[in-house]
Amino acid sequence: MPDIKTSILIVEDEESVRTSLEEVLTFFGYRTRSAADGLAVLKVIREEVPEILLSDLNMPAMSGFELLSIIHRRFPAIYVIAMSGMFTENQIPSGVTADAFYKKGDGVRDLLKIVEARPLERRELPDTPEPIWVQRNGHDVSGGEFVTIACPECFRTFPQAINDTTSLILDTRCAFCDSRIRYGIVDPAASSFRDVFSRHPLSPTPAL
């Protein structure tokens, strides 16, 4: 049996399948958590990044195809296993970013072989997200300033009202996946990125 600390996050919208996978993998010594769709996964991952992600490809809200693309970019250390009842390993559409594939309906031994093939080395990921930089978009119908933010986790965009005009780095939450986003505002009228920092004399000026 594996080390009890090895964690697997199961992503499956069918509750009966999700529960069965959790029970089987827990029985064989894995520490499991689960989520019903891609957006829910991003919230679960913020609590603890798993060693292994076992994800269905066809799900509501955010498909497995989209989810695996995000995981590949944001959490490259996670070993990703795609699963589906619609495809075989030789029929997976190109562009699916997964380390392995499990066909639904195959035996438990097949699944365990795939899980146990995960490399043991794992690169640690930073706890604090890097800030993104955005420009002011103008004013909303009530006259308030806002910016448009593209979430670095789920890649969806949403408007964000500007309430704090003094801080260099601001915090917000994604309107879709609720992930923490740190962002700074670049004034389009500024002659250069350095001008952003000139308004904050106590902030260090970056090397350009």
Predicted regions and their residues:
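Short amphipathic alpha-helix used as the core "switch/output" element in two-component signaling
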Residues: 65-76
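Two-component/phosphorelay signaling modules centered on CheY-like receiver
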Residues: 14-33
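Hydrophobic/aromatic residues positioned on beta-strands within the core alpha/beta folds
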Residues: 81-83
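Alpha4 helix (beta4-alpha4-beta5 surface) of REC/receiver domains from two-component response regulators
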Residues: 66, 85-114, 123-126
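Receiver (REC) domain active-site loop signature in two-component systems and cognate sites
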Residues: 59
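Helix N-cap/capping motif at the beta->alpha junctions
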Residues: 34-43, 64
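C-terminal output/effector regions of signal-responsive regulators
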Residues: 131-208
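Active-site residues of response regulator receiver
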Residues: 56
